[in-house]
Curated annotation (Swiss-Prot):
Substrate binds at N77, H83, D90, L104, S105, R114. It comes from the Bacteria. GO terms for molecular function: 3-dehydroquinate dehydratase activity. Homododecamer. The gene is aroQ. It catalyses: 3-dehydroquinate = 3-dehydroshikimate + H2O. Keywords: Amino-acid biosynthesis, Aromatic amino acid biosynthesis, Lyase. It holds the Pfam family DHquinase_II. Its EC number is 4.2.1.10. InterPro entries: DHquinase_II, DHquinase_II_CS, DHquinase_II_sf. One of its GO terms (biological process) is quinate catabolic process. This is 3-dehydroquinate dehydratase. Gene3D superfamilies: Dehydroquinase, class II (3.40.50.9100).
Amino acid sequence: MAGKFHILLLNGPNLNMLGTREPDIYGSLTLDDIVSKLSEEAHQSGVKFSHLQSNAEFELINRIHSAQGNTDFILINPAAFTHTSVALRDALLTVKIPFIEIHLSNVHAREPFRHHSYLSDLAVGVICGLGVDGYSFALQAAVNRLSKFN
C-alpha cells in the first residue's frame, strides 16, 4: 500500500518470543499478533508500514541506516538493547528520523539495570508499561505528529 507517510516498526531481541516469554510481564499475544494489528491500524490511517524484528544489533542498525530518505517515523522497542546499545543510539542520531521508544512493561518498576535508556533522551516520546496498547498509542502519535508537521 502506498501511503502518504512511511512508518517503520523495529523490535529488538527476544520479542520474537512474545506469547510464551514471561506472559505475566509481557502478555500472551505473539509479536505476529501485535504486528498484524498495527499493520491494520496503519492501513486504516493511510500510512505505509514496515517491520523488522531482530535479535542481532547490527541488523537493527542496518535497517535504521537504510530508512534514511524513505521513512518518516520510527517506532522502536529496543528491548534489552535499550540499556546497552550506544550503537543503536548513534544510528538513530545519524539518520535524524523522529522516533518513539516503546516498552511493553514499565521498565522503571523493574530491576535497576532496566531504568536507564540510551535512547530516551533522543526520542520524541517514550511509552512504557501499557502493554500491547503502547504500540497503538505510538502509531497514533506518530501519524498525528506527521500530519501536523507535514
